[in-house]
Amino acid sequence: MYENKMNLEFVSKSQNEAFARVAVAAFIAQLDPTIDEISDVKTAVSEAVTNSIIHGYENKEDGVIKIEVEICDGEVTIEITDNGKGIEDIPKVMEPLYTSRPDLERSGMGFTVMETFMDGLLVESEKEKGTRVRMKKKFNILS
């Protein structure tokens, strides 16, 4: 059984979204993923971190975003957590094209993208306490 784990913590500045995406991609590179698999994970991480910054912290740059990545037998679990304002109605925000910020010309496709590119998605949130997004992706490991 192969296992590994990484933790990352950064402030909610939009510039850190690219860092988070690349850091997670570099960590999962040990599984020898395809370019498409790396791209899928980077996109999903980008969407989750962007949601934390824009919606959770409402672009305030003093929030903290935590990422935990765990590898276990070819399955990667990525957990992205913020202590932002939380989500009141999770089923509603997970509907395609729903956006709470139409003023920002957001597409409302973040959770749809995460669901499409990953093998599993779980969103947990509590009003005024924050949100946790847990995503899973399976990789074929060559022995």
UniProtKB/Swiss-Prot annotation:
User: Which ranges of the sequence are coiled-coil?
Assistant: none
User: What protein family is recorded?
Assistant: Belongs to the anti-sigma-factor family.
Keyword Nucleus among UniProt keywords: no
Q: Which InterPro entries match?
A: Anti-sigma-factor_SerPK, Anti-sigma_F, HATPase_C_sf
Protein name, please?
A: Anti-sigma F factor
Give the protein's function: Binds to sigma F and blocks its ability to form an RNA polymerase holoenzyme (E-sigma F). Phosphorylates SpoIIAA on a serine residue. This phosphorylation may enable SpoIIAA to act as an anti-anti-sigma factor that counteracts SpoIIAB and thus releases sigma F from inhibition.
Taxonomic lineage of the native organism: Bacteria, Bacillati, Bacillota, Clostridia, Eubacteriales
Task: Name the UniProt key words of this record, in alphabetical order.
Answer: ATP-binding, Kinase, Nucleotide-binding, Serine/threonine-protein kinase, Sporulation, Transferase
Q: Which reaction does it catalyse?
A: L-seryl-[protein] + ATP = O-phospho-L-seryl-[protein] + ADP + H(+); L-threonyl-[protein] + ATP = O-phospho-L-threonyl-[protein] + ADP + H(+)
Q: Which gene encodes it?
A: spoIIAB
* The organism of origin for this protein: Clostridium botulinum (strain Eklund 17B / Type B)
PANTHER family this protein is in? Answer: ANTI-SIGMA-F FACTOR RSBW, ANTI-SIGMA-F FACTOR RSBW-RELATED
Example GO biological process:
negative regulation of sporulation resulting in formation of a cellular spore
One Gene Ontology molecular-function label: protein serine/threonine kinase activity
The EC number(s) this enzyme carries: 2.7.11.1
